[in-house]
Amino acid sequence: MPSLDHFGIIAPYYDRTIPLKAPQHLIELIGLPIEGAILDAGGGTGRVAQAFEHLATRVVVVDLSIGMLRQARQKGGLWPVCSETESLPFPDASFERIVMVDALHHVLSQKRTVNELWRVLKSGGRIVIEEPDVRKLSVKFVALFEKIALMRSHFIAPPEIIAMFAHLNAMTQIKLDGFNAWVIVDKN
């Protein structure tokens, strides 16, 4: 039975109802500006990626929702690509930076996604994953709502995200700020 395309339904309203907060903080965590390409994995409408448009040579937005990517295309300056994050259509070492904001809990296989992000990251590159910190009570309510709404979400704590990178010999760190956590992964 096909699942409901929640994101396709909300795509035209997404940017207005969920605006990007504090892009400067994310820009600093990612380490911008750079010469090279940035991948916004699970980037939907490109609301995050548009903050990087003039800070890199190319900004690619990957998402599975055609409705969300239509919104990204309207922004201009972004390269929207329809794909699962578990099987990215890019050669190895394609990106200097990768960001995944509020999306890891929506993918079917977090482990495969992590491995794919690592595969397409260049040596010397950085991945920043921003996720709601499921250890917080308010996030537990969000997780419950998404489960009731049949949104295939699977929230995991920041240390569990870090553990998925352990076999890759990645340099990792966690930054916390209330509702969100940022997992920062560097590839030597």
Regions found by a protein language model. Name each.
Residues 111-123:
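A short glycine-rich, Lys/Arg-flanked "PGG" loop and its adjoining helix->strand segment in the class I
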Residues 102-103:
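Short catalytic micro-motifs in class I SAM-dependent methyltransferases
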Residues 17-18, 48, 128-183:
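C-terminal alpha-helical "lid/dimerization" subdomain adjacent to the S-adenosyl-L-methionine
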Residues 39-41, 45-87:
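Class I SAM-dependent methyltransferase SAM/SAH-binding core
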Residues 184-188:
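C-terminal lobe and adjacent flexible extensions of AdoMet/dcAdoMet transferase-like proteins
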